């Protein structure tokens, strides 16, 4: 074993919330509540806050009305107040820090920053925990609220995937400043086309994919977790019957090995649903899995199931108006 082993950084604990932008706010709310079983926990101005029934925090999703679909921001929780201060120092050194805000519904003061590609992010420690109403309390004491009796309810927030003009640069930024660890990666003759990184034993809390037009700051998808593959078939049946577009029906990824499906919410954002956890990483000396792009189609993207459409590789939000070329 090398004596130069780099001590891991455990200052970021988890993906805590994501803000989506939607030009059809109320229709987006219907999708997430009526069909995915999420609960509205607050409204403020032109924003609505939601959570899944096994999310312990006040909210994990904020949807804000906007002219275009896309990403508002990504929120990370630090592992301690001291960890927050350490990460802020590194973010300030990077030149991409934007400064402190007092907080938002569901969390305390936060330090805002951007990725090199311009995705808005923030990191904080103080959070508000969800407090169920009496009728929502469950006898299952390790669950924060009852399983909803509507739709096919998702259980918790899982991960975010962002499109970027330079996946390699954004990946290294997250590794260097926040302590993320590289789990899997797609390369094409040395060029990085996609990275899956995490701060926990999950395969990823965030991924970066190549934006084919070199456009910056795009969202590829937001993912919520079921943990049971059959739930994906139940949801697909429900959504098709109610005329929601399913881009990729229930399927198994090669990269991450997760059972998945992709749909579009009414505002235009791609939403992924996970039917299981894929695989977990507990090895402290994990070597990243490197895929060559030529080996990805039919193996890395889909291991079991239908071939992924070109739109999965090309389309992010906001939607580009340029002609796109598959990476």
Swiss-Prot record:
Record carries keyword Metal-binding: yes
Keywords: Aromatic hydrocarbons catabolism, Dioxygenase, Iron, Metal-binding, Oxidoreductase, Repeat
UniProt domain VOC: residue ranges: 14-126, 156-276
Binding residues for Fe cation: 159, 221, 272
GO biological process, one term: catabolic process
Cofactor or coenzyme needed: Fe(2+)
Catalysed reaction equations from the record: catechol + O2 = (2Z,4E)-2-hydroxy-6-oxohexa-2,4-dienoate + H(+)
Top EC category: oxidoreductase
Enzyme Commission numbers on file: 1.13.11.2
GO MF assignments: catechol 2,3-dioxygenase activity; ferrous iron binding
Similarity comment: Belongs to the extradiol ring-cleavage dioxygenase family.
Stated name of the protein: Metapyrocatechase
